[in-house]
């Protein structure tokens, strides 16, 4: 276990905050706004929710090695949310994957801020931020070695 630099500690805390905000936003839309999640939304939740715990433990222990699964989960989550966004906004993807297999079609757009920001877009940005910040921590630790 290598000691984290102060910059890496701050980035790790920032990742945890991002994961927590994504979890809170997801719960807000489903529990307060009563939006029923589609199948792809559930996959994104499955990949995002554990990140709060994973990065929280890593931040408390001050050890990025605890968070290695988070790098993979955020990368996969980014791919899922990108596909989901394409299902919502690109006609060829709507025909192929619009129905999903759940009770709510995956091409339903509950929110559309500024004409392009939907829930999968917000999830994708969160996954991207987590993924990039994790890579920055690894680079920072590599410089320290």
UniProtKB/Swiss-Prot annotation:
Signal peptide from the UniProt entry: none
Organism: Oceanobacillus iheyensis (strain DSM 14371 / CIP 107618 / JCM 11309 / KCTC 3954 / HTE831)
Name of the protein in question: Probable disulfide formation protein
Transmembrane segments annotated in the record for this chain: 9-28, 43-62, 69-86, 115-137
Keywords in alphabetical order: Cell membrane, Chaperone, Disulfide bond, Electron transport, Membrane, Oxidoreductase, Redox-active center, Transmembrane, Transmembrane helix, Transport
One Gene Ontology term of the molecular function aspect: protein-disulfide reductase activity
GO biological process terms, semicolon-separated: protein folding
Main location: membrane
Subcellular location as annotated: Cell membrane
Cysteine pairings via disulfide bonds: 38-41, 100-106
Membrane topology: Multi-pass membrane protein
